[in-house]
Amino acid sequence: MKPLMLQGHQRAITQIKYNREGDLLFSAAKDSKPNVWWSLNGERLGTFNGHGGVIWCLDVDWQSINLITGGGDSSCRLWDLETGKNIATLKSNSSVRTCNFSYSAYQAAYTTDKAMGHPCEVFVIDTRTIDETVSGQAPILKWEITDSKVTSMIWGSLDETIITGHEAGDLIQWDLRTGKKIHSVKEHTHQITDMQLSRDGTMFVTASKDHTAKLFDTNSLELLKEYKTERPVNSAALSPILDHVVLGGGQDAMEVTTTSTRQGKFDARFFHLVFEEEFGRVKGHFGPINSLAFHPDGKSYASGGEDGYVRVHNFDQSYFDYTFDYNRE
Protein backbone atom coordinates (compact mmCIF):
# COMPACT_ATOMS: atom_id res chain seq x y z
CA MET A 1 0.00 0.00 0.00
CA LYS A 2 2.59 2.51 -1.14
CA PRO A 3 1.08 5.98 -1.06
CA LEU A 4 1.36 8.78 -3.58
CA MET A 5 2.95 11.80 -1.92
CA LEU A 6 1.56 15.08 -3.24
CA GLN A 7 3.85 17.96 -2.38
CA GLY A 8 2.52 21.30 -3.54
CA HIS A 9 1.98 23.28 -0.37
CA GLN A 10 4.42 25.22 1.78
CA ARG A 11 2.30 24.98 4.91
CA ALA A 12 -0.22 22.77 6.71
CA ILE A 13 -3.13 21.26 4.78
CA THR A 14 -6.55 22.47 6.00
CA GLN A 15 -8.97 20.53 3.77
CA ILE A 16 -8.95 18.03 0.89
CA LYS A 17 -11.85 16.96 -1.33
CA TYR A 18 -12.52 14.74 -4.33
CA ASN A 19 -14.90 15.70 -7.10
CA ARG A 20 -17.90 13.43 -7.77
CA GLU A 21 -16.11 11.19 -10.28
CA GLY A 22 -12.96 11.05 -8.17
CA ASP A 23 -10.54 11.89 -10.99
CA LEU A 24 -9.65 15.22 -9.36
CA LEU A 25 -8.41 15.88 -5.83
CA PHE A 26 -8.47 19.40 -4.39
CA SER A 27 -6.31 20.58 -1.51
CA ALA A 28 -6.42 23.76 0.57
CA ALA A 29 -3.66 24.84 2.93
CA LYS A 30 -2.44 27.72 5.05
CA ASP A 31 -0.35 29.04 2.14
CA SER A 32 -3.12 30.86 0.19
CA LYS A 33 -3.01 28.71 -2.99
CA PRO A 34 -5.49 25.83 -3.39
CA ASN A 35 -4.24 23.05 -5.68
CA VAL A 36 -5.93 20.54 -7.96
CA TRP A 37 -4.36 17.14 -8.70
CA TRP A 38 -4.99 14.08 -10.85
CA SER A 39 -5.92 11.55 -8.16
CA LEU A 40 -4.72 8.59 -10.25
CA ASN A 41 -1.04 9.53 -10.56
CA GLY A 42 -0.65 12.52 -8.22
CA GLU A 43 0.21 14.97 -11.01
CA ARG A 44 -0.57 18.58 -10.17
CA LEU A 45 -2.94 20.14 -12.70
CA GLY A 46 -2.78 23.68 -11.38
CA THR A 47 -3.24 26.22 -8.62
CA PHE A 48 -5.91 28.84 -7.97
CA ASN A 49 -4.15 32.15 -7.31
CA GLY A 50 -5.93 35.11 -5.73
CA HIS A 51 -6.42 34.63 -2.00
CA GLY A 52 -4.32 36.72 0.35
CA GLY A 53 -4.15 34.41 3.34
CA VAL A 54 -4.86 30.99 4.76
CA ILE A 55 -7.52 28.92 2.95
CA TRP A 56 -9.83 27.27 5.48
CA CYS A 57 -12.28 25.52 3.19
CA LEU A 58 -13.09 24.51 -0.37
CA ASP A 59 -15.76 22.62 -2.29
CA VAL A 60 -16.38 21.59 -5.89
CA ASP A 61 -19.80 21.31 -7.53
CA TRP A 62 -21.09 17.96 -8.81
CA GLN A 63 -20.34 18.75 -12.46
CA SER A 64 -16.76 19.85 -11.69
CA ILE A 65 -17.34 23.23 -13.33
CA ASN A 66 -16.82 25.57 -10.38
CA LEU A 67 -14.82 25.66 -7.16
CA ILE A 68 -15.65 27.67 -4.04
CA THR A 69 -12.99 28.61 -1.47
CA GLY A 70 -13.02 30.59 1.76
CA GLY A 71 -10.12 32.01 3.68
CA GLY A 72 -8.54 34.19 6.31
CA ASP A 73 -8.41 37.18 3.95
CA SER A 74 -12.14 37.68 4.72
CA SER A 75 -13.32 36.55 1.31
CA CYS A 76 -15.17 33.69 -0.32
CA ARG A 77 -14.18 33.13 -3.96
CA LEU A 78 -15.73 31.30 -6.89
CA TRP A 79 -13.43 29.85 -9.55
CA ASP A 80 -13.71 28.44 -13.06
CA LEU A 81 -12.23 24.98 -12.71
CA GLU A 82 -11.05 24.60 -16.29
CA THR A 83 -9.12 27.86 -16.53
CA GLY A 84 -8.34 28.56 -12.85
CA LYS A 85 -9.85 32.03 -13.26
CA ASN A 86 -11.28 33.79 -10.20
CA ILE A 87 -14.82 34.59 -11.39
CA ALA A 88 -16.29 36.26 -8.33
CA THR A 89 -15.15 37.43 -4.90
CA LEU A 90 -17.56 37.79 -1.98
CA LYS A 91 -16.12 40.03 0.72
CA SER A 92 -16.97 39.38 4.37
CA ASN A 93 -16.20 41.07 7.68
CA SER A 94 -14.14 38.19 9.08
CA SER A 95 -12.51 34.91 8.03
CA VAL A 96 -14.62 32.49 6.00
CA ARG A 97 -14.43 29.23 7.96
CA THR A 98 -16.64 26.84 5.96
CA CYS A 99 -18.08 26.78 2.43
CA ASN A 100 -20.16 24.21 0.55
CA PHE A 101 -22.13 23.90 -2.66
CA SER A 102 -25.59 22.39 -2.29
CA TYR A 103 -26.08 19.01 -3.99
CA SER A 104 -27.72 20.65 -7.01
CA ALA A 105 -25.05 23.41 -7.02
CA TYR A 106 -27.86 25.96 -7.52
CA GLN A 107 -26.86 27.43 -4.17
CA ALA A 108 -23.79 27.64 -1.99
CA ALA A 109 -23.40 28.45 1.69
CA TYR A 110 -20.51 29.83 3.68
CA THR A 111 -19.97 30.88 7.28
CA THR A 112 -17.78 33.56 8.82
CA ASP A 113 -15.96 33.67 12.15
CA LYS A 114 -16.94 35.68 15.19
CA ALA A 115 -14.02 38.13 15.20
CA MET A 116 -13.08 41.81 15.23
CA GLY A 117 -16.42 42.77 16.75
CA HIS A 118 -18.40 41.00 14.01
CA PRO A 119 -20.75 38.08 14.75
CA CYS A 120 -20.52 34.61 13.25
CA GLU A 121 -22.88 34.57 10.25
CA VAL A 122 -24.22 32.08 7.70
CA PHE A 123 -24.70 33.21 4.09
CA VAL A 124 -26.59 31.38 1.34
CA ILE A 125 -25.93 32.59 -2.22
CA ASP A 126 -27.44 31.84 -5.63
CA THR A 127 -24.94 30.01 -7.85
CA ARG A 128 -27.14 29.09 -10.82
CA THR A 129 -25.26 31.56 -12.99
CA ILE A 130 -21.74 32.28 -11.85
CA ASP A 131 -20.21 35.40 -13.38
CA GLU A 132 -18.76 38.75 -12.27
CA THR A 133 -22.17 39.98 -11.07
CA VAL A 134 -22.15 37.45 -8.19
CA SER A 135 -19.62 39.65 -6.35
CA GLY A 136 -22.17 42.45 -6.00
CA GLN A 137 -25.22 40.30 -5.33
CA ALA A 138 -26.84 40.23 -1.92
CA PRO A 139 -27.14 36.74 -0.38
CA ILE A 140 -30.49 34.94 -0.71
CA LEU A 141 -30.43 34.33 3.01
CA LYS A 142 -28.23 35.43 5.87
CA TRP A 143 -28.51 34.91 9.60
CA GLU A 144 -26.47 35.51 12.71
CA ILE A 145 -25.23 32.74 14.98
CA THR A 146 -25.70 33.74 18.60
CA ASP A 147 -24.35 30.45 19.98
CA SER A 148 -20.68 29.44 19.72
CA LYS A 149 -19.14 29.94 16.27
CA VAL A 150 -19.59 27.55 13.35
CA THR A 151 -16.55 25.33 12.74
CA SER A 152 -18.00 22.89 10.18
CA MET A 153 -21.05 22.66 7.92
CA ILE A 154 -22.89 20.36 5.51
CA TRP A 155 -26.08 20.56 3.44
CA GLY A 156 -28.97 18.38 4.58
CA SER A 157 -31.21 16.22 2.42
CA LEU A 158 -32.86 17.67 -0.70
CA ASP A 159 -31.02 20.98 -0.18
CA GLU A 160 -33.78 22.02 2.26
CA THR A 161 -31.61 22.29 5.36
CA ILE A 162 -28.10 23.16 6.48
CA ILE A 163 -26.47 21.43 9.44
CA THR A 164 -23.78 23.34 11.32
CA GLY A 165 -21.23 22.02 13.81
CA HIS A 166 -20.08 24.44 16.50
CA GLU A 167 -17.10 25.25 18.70
CA ALA A 168 -18.97 24.19 21.84
CA GLY A 169 -19.94 20.81 20.34
CA ASP A 170 -23.52 21.63 19.26
CA LEU A 171 -25.11 20.39 16.03
CA ILE A 172 -27.86 22.65 14.68
CA GLN A 173 -30.20 22.03 11.76
CA TRP A 174 -31.49 25.14 9.95
CA ASP A 175 -34.52 25.57 7.69
CA LEU A 176 -33.39 27.23 4.46
CA ARG A 177 -36.78 28.72 3.71
CA THR A 178 -36.74 30.84 6.86
CA GLY A 179 -33.20 30.73 8.26
CA LYS A 180 -34.71 29.49 11.53
CA LYS A 181 -33.38 26.72 13.76
CA ILE A 182 -35.30 23.44 13.35
CA HIS A 183 -33.60 21.56 16.16
CA SER A 184 -30.25 21.06 17.79
CA VAL A 185 -28.39 18.36 19.70
CA LYS A 186 -25.27 18.47 21.84
CA GLU A 187 -23.56 15.09 21.76
CA HIS A 188 -19.98 16.42 21.67
CA THR A 189 -18.27 18.18 24.57
CA HIS A 190 -15.68 20.05 22.47
CA GLN A 191 -15.34 21.65 19.05
CA ILE A 192 -16.66 19.77 16.02
CA THR A 193 -13.77 19.87 13.57
CA ASP A 194 -15.26 18.10 10.55
CA MET A 195 -18.55 16.77 9.15
CA GLN A 196 -18.90 14.48 6.12
CA LEU A 197 -21.98 12.92 4.56
CA SER A 198 -22.41 9.27 3.63
CA ARG A 199 -22.73 8.48 -0.06
CA ASP A 200 -26.54 8.44 -0.03
CA GLY A 201 -26.78 11.47 2.27
CA THR A 202 -28.84 9.69 4.94
CA MET A 203 -26.09 9.80 7.58
CA PHE A 204 -23.10 11.93 8.39
CA VAL A 205 -20.02 11.53 10.56
CA THR A 206 -18.61 14.23 12.83
CA ALA A 207 -15.07 14.55 14.17
CA SER A 208 -14.39 16.38 17.41
CA LYS A 209 -11.67 17.53 19.78
CA ASP A 210 -13.39 15.52 22.52
CA HIS A 211 -11.51 12.44 21.17
CA THR A 212 -14.54 10.93 19.41
CA ALA A 213 -16.16 10.70 16.01
CA LYS A 214 -19.91 10.13 15.89
CA LEU A 215 -22.45 9.00 13.32
CA PHE A 216 -25.76 10.88 13.05
CA ASP A 217 -28.98 10.60 11.08
CA THR A 218 -29.16 13.53 8.65
CA ASN A 219 -32.87 14.25 9.10
CA SER A 220 -33.41 13.70 12.82
CA LEU A 221 -29.84 14.35 14.12
CA GLU A 222 -30.24 11.13 16.11
CA LEU A 223 -26.92 9.74 17.39
CA LEU A 224 -26.37 6.33 15.80
CA LYS A 225 -22.78 5.29 16.57
CA GLU A 226 -19.68 6.51 18.41
CA TYR A 227 -16.00 5.87 17.65
CA LYS A 228 -13.65 6.55 20.56
CA THR A 229 -9.92 7.36 20.48
CA GLU A 230 -7.38 8.75 22.97
CA ARG A 231 -6.66 12.04 21.22
CA PRO A 232 -8.41 14.82 19.31
CA VAL A 233 -10.03 13.80 16.00
CA ASN A 234 -9.56 16.38 13.24
CA SER A 235 -11.35 14.58 10.43
CA ALA A 236 -13.53 11.54 9.73
CA ALA A 237 -14.81 10.07 6.46
CA LEU A 238 -17.25 7.29 5.53
CA SER A 239 -16.43 4.62 2.95
CA PRO A 240 -18.84 4.74 -0.02
CA ILE A 241 -18.78 0.94 -0.52
CA LEU A 242 -18.03 -0.72 2.83
CA ASP A 243 -19.16 -0.29 6.43
CA HIS A 244 -15.95 1.50 7.35
CA VAL A 245 -15.10 4.89 8.79
CA VAL A 246 -11.61 6.41 8.86
CA LEU A 247 -10.48 8.85 11.57
CA GLY A 248 -7.47 11.14 11.58
CA GLY A 249 -6.06 13.54 14.13
CA GLY A 250 -3.33 13.78 16.71
CA GLN A 251 -2.37 16.36 19.28
CA ASP A 252 -2.70 20.07 18.76
CA ALA A 253 -0.15 21.30 16.25
CA MET A 254 1.78 23.32 18.83
CA GLU A 255 2.64 20.18 20.83
CA VAL A 256 3.81 18.13 17.88
CA THR A 257 7.53 18.86 18.19
CA THR A 258 7.73 16.95 21.46
CA THR A 259 6.60 13.53 20.19
CA SER A 260 7.97 10.71 18.09
CA THR A 261 6.01 9.39 15.10
CA ARG A 262 6.61 5.90 16.50
CA GLN A 263 3.99 6.51 19.16
CA GLY A 264 1.32 6.13 16.51
CA LYS A 265 -0.37 9.40 17.31
CA PHE A 266 -0.63 10.49 13.69
CA ASP A 267 -2.04 7.32 12.15
CA ALA A 268 -5.22 7.13 10.13
CA ARG A 269 -7.46 4.75 12.07
CA PHE A 270 -10.11 2.52 10.51
CA PHE A 271 -13.23 1.57 12.46
CA HIS A 272 -16.13 -0.69 11.57
CA LEU A 273 -19.18 1.51 11.02
CA VAL A 274 -21.63 -0.78 12.81
CA PHE A 275 -19.54 -2.45 15.52
CA GLU A 276 -17.51 0.65 16.47
CA GLU A 277 -14.33 -1.49 16.62
CA GLU A 278 -10.96 -0.34 15.34
CA PHE A 279 -9.51 -2.85 12.84
CA GLY A 280 -6.60 -1.10 11.16
CA ARG A 281 -4.15 1.80 11.10
CA VAL A 282 -2.12 3.50 8.40
CA LYS A 283 1.05 5.37 9.29
CA GLY A 284 2.68 8.11 7.28
CA HIS A 285 2.29 11.73 8.31
CA PHE A 286 4.87 13.61 10.40
CA GLY A 287 2.20 15.46 12.32
CA PRO A 288 -1.55 15.45 12.87
CA ILE A 289 -3.89 14.57 10.02
CA ASN A 290 -6.10 17.60 9.35
CA SER A 291 -8.37 16.27 6.61
CA LEU A 292 -9.46 12.90 5.21
CA ALA A 293 -11.45 11.91 2.13
CA PHE A 294 -12.47 8.59 0.61
CA HIS A 295 -12.27 8.25 -3.16
CA PRO A 296 -15.84 7.96 -4.53
CA ASP A 297 -15.12 4.40 -5.74
CA GLY A 298 -14.01 3.39 -2.22
CA LYS A 299 -10.77 1.83 -3.48
CA SER A 300 -8.45 4.49 -2.07
CA TYR A 301 -8.42 7.37 0.36
CA ALA A 302 -6.42 10.58 0.79
CA SER A 303 -5.15 12.37 3.88
CA GLY A 304 -3.83 15.89 4.33
CA GLY A 305 -1.57 16.67 7.25
CA GLU A 306 0.03 19.40 9.30
CA ASP A 307 3.28 18.45 7.51
CA GLY A 308 1.97 20.00 4.26
CA TYR A 309 1.74 16.70 2.36
CA VAL A 310 -1.30 15.06 0.82
CA ARG A 311 -0.98 11.27 0.75
CA VAL A 312 -3.15 9.12 -1.52
CA HIS A 313 -3.35 5.48 -0.38
CA ASN A 314 -4.67 2.74 -2.68
CA PHE A 315 -6.06 -0.19 -0.71
CA ASP A 316 -4.58 -3.67 -1.13
CA GLN A 317 -6.86 -6.59 -1.99
CA SER A 318 -6.63 -7.81 1.62
CA TYR A 319 -8.60 -4.72 2.70
CA PHE A 320 -11.59 -5.78 0.57
CA ASP A 321 -11.30 -9.47 1.54
CA TYR A 322 -11.34 -8.70 5.25
CA THR A 323 -14.59 -9.54 7.02
CA PHE A 324 -15.42 -8.76 10.61
CA ASP A 325 -15.82 -11.87 12.76
CA TYR A 326 -19.22 -12.06 14.39
CA ASN A 327 -21.90 -14.67 15.01
CA ARG A 328 -24.47 -14.85 12.25
CA GLU A 329 -26.99 -16.76 14.39
From Swiss-Prot:
WD repeats lie at residues 8-47, 50-89, 145-184, 187-226, 284-323. Pfam families: EIF3I (PF24805). GO terms for biological process: formation of cytoplasmic translation initiation complex. Coiled coil: none annotated. Its main location: cytoplasm. One of its GO terms (molecular function) is translation initiation factor activity. SUPFAM superfamilies: WD40 repeat-like (SSF50978). InterPro entries: eIF3i, WD40/YVTN_repeat-like_dom_sf, WD40_repeat_CS, WD40_repeat_dom_sf, WD40_rpt. One of its GO terms (cellular component) is eukaryotic 43S preinitiation complex. It is found in: Cytoplasm. Keywords: Cytoplasm, Initiation factor, Protein biosynthesis, Repeat, WD repeat. PANTHER family: EUKARYOTIC TRANSLATION INITIATION FACTOR 3 SUBUNIT I. Component of the eukaryotic translation initiation factor 3 (eIF-3) complex, which is involved in protein synthesis of a specialized repertoire of mRNAs and, together with other initiation factors, stimulates binding of mRNA and methionyl-tRNAi to the 40S ribosome. The eIF-3 complex specifically targets and initiates translation of a subset of mRNAs involved in cell proliferation. Component of the eukaryotic translation initiation factor 3 (eIF-3) complex. Belongs to the eIF-3 subunit I family. This is Eukaryotic translation initiation factor 3 subunit I.
